[in-house]
């Protein structure tokens, strides 16, 4: 009698699991629609949060990639002329920030630095001590970054925290300057 009473429970569990796996697998069209919906949520969030005091960044959709938003953060920073901010939505349900410091009219680049090894060590050390991680892209340009997964929904408050964290990155560019310019730079 106990065996018969477990049979319906097992069947019900298998049915639930098969439905869950069927809903998790998206068709390419559904995946693209979800990515477009995420882009529109991100567009609205950047439009609402960008003008706020402490953020003060005006984003626009990239001409090169329709799933990227770009902006320049300028003013009030003693070590950088600006930060170029790129916010992108990937094919893999993530939103990524790449924040490039503009120093002396150009990107900070590990290959062009006077002390490339020292700069790379500094980037690794900053990644250990900062909210945002530091890295270099395929061309050697240095950036601060953060990546959100969308598994638990759209992270609107967390994205705003990253936006508030952009201007304070200037202090870390100041710590990189001796490696970029050489030991006499301060």
Task: Give the predicted meaning of each segment.
Residues 9-18:
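Bacterial N-terminal signal peptides
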Residues 177-186:
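Short, highly charged C-terminal tails/helix-capping segments
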Residues 124-173:
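A short, solvent-exposed beta-edge/loop patch
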Residues 1-10:
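Bacterial N-terminal signal peptides that target proteins for export
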């Amino acid at each position: 009698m106990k065996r018969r009473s477990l049979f319906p429970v097992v069947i019900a569990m298998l049915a639930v699991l098969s439905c869950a796996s069927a809903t998790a697998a998206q068709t390419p069209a559904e995946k693209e629609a979800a990515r477009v919906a995420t882009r529109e949520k991100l567009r609205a969030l950047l439009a609402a949060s960008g003008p706020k005091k402490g953020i003060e960044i005006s984003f626009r959709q990239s001409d090169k990639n329709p799933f990227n938003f770009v902006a320049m953060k300028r003013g009030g920073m003693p070590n950088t002329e600006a930060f170029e901010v790129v916010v992108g939505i990937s094919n893999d349900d993530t939103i990524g920030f790449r924040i490039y410091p503009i120093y002396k009219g150009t990107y900070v680049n590990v290959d062009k630095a006077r002390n490339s090894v020292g700069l790379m060590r500094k980037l690794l050390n900053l990644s250990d001590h900062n909210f945002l991680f530091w890295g270099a892209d395929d061309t050697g340009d240095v950036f601060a970054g953060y990546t959100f997964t969308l598994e638990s929904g759209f992270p609107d408050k967390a994205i705003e925290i990253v936006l508030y964290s952009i201007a304070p990155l200037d202090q870390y560019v100041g710590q990189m300057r001796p490696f970029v310019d050489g030991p006499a730079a301060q």
